[in-house]
Amino acid sequence: MQQKVSDPMALTTTQVRQLRALAHHLNPAILIGKADVTDALVKQAEQALEAHELIKCAVQDGSDLSAREAAHALAERTNAEVVQVIGHRFSLYRESSREDIDHIKL
């Protein structure tokens, strides 16, 4: 019988709750429109995650993707975790490798 290897980045329920509380007050840093998830959008998200660790994104009405689809597509391409999806908005978290910022303590 094979053991399932857990994802080292997987967040606990307590960590998700803490990140949701922090993300509540954020304004969307990334807007996803008609072009969906492009390389330029991924690069912008990478930069925002490195600078802030926790970002909020919004899917505009013209997009062909739902917020859940966009969240998972962007999280996969940026190696981030989806914290929460509500309506047209979602939050992503990834620990930053930068040492010059205040890291979120989980």
Segments predicted by a language model, with ranges:
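Positively charged, polar, low-complexity stretches
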Residues: 2-106
